Amino acid sequence: MTRTRSDSLAAGGLNWNSMPLKLFAGGNAKFWDPADIDFSRDRADWESLSNLERDWATRLCAQFIAGEEAVTQDIQPFMAAMRAEGRLGDEMYLTQFAFEEAKHTQVFRMWLDAVGMTDDLQCYLDDLPSYRQMFYEELPASLEALATDPSPAAQVRASATYNHVIEGMMALTGYYAWHRICVDRKVLPGMQELVRRIGDDERRHMAWGTFTCRRHVAADDANWEVFENRMNELIPLALSNTDDSFALYDEIPFGFAKEEFQQYAADKGMRRFGTISSARGRALAEIDVDYSPLQLEDTFAAEDSRVLATSA
């Protein structure tokens, strides 16, 4: 691609109130370094768990770190799609997005090292067919498609896959599980801090995905059907991952119940439809400075905090 101009030099400069640059500024303001998290108490807490509890938690962590690594590798075509569309603000935000995914991979690996889990953990994903289909097939296929087809419809499919189903259902459910483990047992303070930091980053990621789908739906109502179809295709797969995880254990640790996590994941997925559909027929200029996508993620976080405070 030949460069003919620089958007940062345009009259009026950049629109710092636009959603992508608002998220970019937020990420800068909330920067954190994995090396600053204290994991010193987590090793003793980890060893105090039963073998069954450690096995469950290791499988949960394996899903997280493999997912963070996958997105670090797969997200680049979305940046190229933003460049092709001439959206510098989105491109700036996605550079931060990719950096944060790499940082999340780093911090989960640091935690595993700190608690002594240094063996090959790939086997913890072998018995999770829905997880492997989502991360080994659906995610890379939907994002790699943008390299040859950066169209709005392809962007909506990619965002629905990653931002709305993987982050917006599967990851949120996993964070909820970690919070339940740590808060109920009052253990693993390093993991608690790790999840808090990552969760804050990923609320911005999900908000960007919602914003992206909303602007495409506002521009062309046909993209609403694209979003709806992709979500309806992948939500059952996300819920199947919970089934797969629970089916591996005759005895379920931590007092967990499959129905609780299925309901949690389904609720987060279904509530995303309303936020996207509310953009139908809206002016694009309104969508660009509408912060409701971020407000939705903050609402989810506040709800979780109330539930966990009650159970503590």
Curated annotation (Swiss-Prot):
Q: Which domain of life is it from?
A: Bacteria
| Cysteines joined through disulfide linkages | none
Any one Gene Ontology molecular-function term assigned to this protein's record: metal ion binding
* Cofactor(s) for this UniProt protein: Fe cation; Mn(2+)
Instruction: Return the cofactor note field.
Output: Binds 1 Fe cation per subunit.
Q: Where does Fe cation bind?
A: E101, E167, E202, H205
Gene3D superfamilies, alphabetized: Ribonucleotide Reductase, subunit A
Protein residues bound to Mn(2+): E68, E101, H104
Its EC top class is oxidoreductase
What is the recorded function of this protein according to its Swiss-Prot or TrEMBL entry?
Probable oxidase that might be involved in lipid metabolism.
Name of this protein: R2-like ligand binding oxidase
